[in-house]
Amino acid sequence: MQVVLVTEMASSLKIWVIVLTLLCILCRLLVYRKDVSWREFMKQHHLSPSREFNEYKCNVLMREQEALKDKSSHVFIYVSEYKIGGICINGNWRDRYRNTYVWLQNALKVLRCHQENDNNGYTESRSFDYVEFHCGTDGHVDSIEDLKMVEPISD
């Protein structure tokens, strides 16, 4: 009787360990899920000010990333990561805009890439634009919604 009871307790304990492990994994996925769209946005649209704006070339940028290879046009923004991180913050750093659109008050440098008719490369246009961002349900920027050109940038 005691051997059976100990065996049942051991198997019950194994089940609880498995259930708790799965719950921990699920919680981690939910907590870090927000970073996926943010990281993907940054990877696809962000140009770091650590390099000069005119050093960025569409032909290189569009071929560097697998996700952009088949796109006929794309928009890149030249701004600090810190500034993008603060776009969805509503006053207090804990309070974030969620599932809403936010126009940035200052114009940003924007690089637009358009595939040429012969598909051999990309034409680029550079300008200062007001940018409307979408703040996702996680309270972080996940897309560029709209652009309003203020002034073209000539080489």
How does the language model describe each region?
Residues 2-110:
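N-terminal "domain-start" segment
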Residues 88, 113, 135:
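Short cysteine clusters
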Residues 94, 108-123:
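A domain-level detector for eukaryotic transcription factor DNA-interaction modules
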Residues 116-155:
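Compact beta-sheet-dominated globular domain cores
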